């Protein structure tokens, strides 16, 4: 789903963009060697204690979230521009873990915000721009999961709040 809205005014131009992705199905069939292994497991030749993963109904499991949202709100007037960008990724179950009461371990959703400010100008007859940005404005950390880095790197990033300053000149 995409929603786009633009308005021009005396105090500047405003732009709002929202994109939402919603999955209701995410399935993968076993093929090749996995198909043969699944047949052996179905026949009882491979014990139930040995899981075969990566196919079947994968929605909401192991990094496959069922929704993702992006929102960008920007304003510009003359040489000035400010933009706020948000990204939210939905929650999912980590199937290799469970809670003591038998409930599945849910890796919660994660939302990050980025703020960018820029100014365009001329420098010695060349177009130039200076930009300052704060990525992960609220210092959101990736949700804890039982993975190599303590979070699900296939679905999340754990960079923490960071800043950059960019200077561009067109020669």
Give names to the regions the model predicted.
Residues 9, 64, 75, 106-108, ...:
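Surface-exposed coil/turn segments at beta-strand junctions on protein surfaces, enriched
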Residues 1-96:
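Gram-negative outer-membrane beta-barrel transporters
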Residues 54-59, 99-105, 150-155:
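Extracellular loop and loop/strand-boundary signature of outer-membrane beta-barrel proteins
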